[in-house]
């Protein structure tokens, strides 16, 4: 649709891996599947968190539904890498299944919003830093253009004269 692939948003992919790893741990704690499967899933998730396998997330960022495509993409990438880490071939889902194991005890309506919330919670620190940099840039432009007089505008009409610097400082 947009031509923009999910792989261009590594923080979203990493958050998905964190959610899948936490769910796998909970499933083992509840006896849903074995520690061997958990080890494979954790290994795959750690690789994703470390920035690997992101090239396998080629879905468009805009998609129908409530994130089902993204959730299943994550499940399949994690399951296939987990299989390799466990000594099996990709697609040998009897050992680690994308739906039954990686997505075990979850739905898209659990995993997708949780991963997006996690991404926002983890990303806010960087956002604050970038906002502070933007504020500093506006202040610098405000000083640079403080002597350039221009007509102010309000309600699509001319208003009180102001400097271009004052306009930048308003941001």
Describe the residue ranges of each PLM region:
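Conserved, well-structured ligand/cofactor-binding cores
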Residues: 1-171
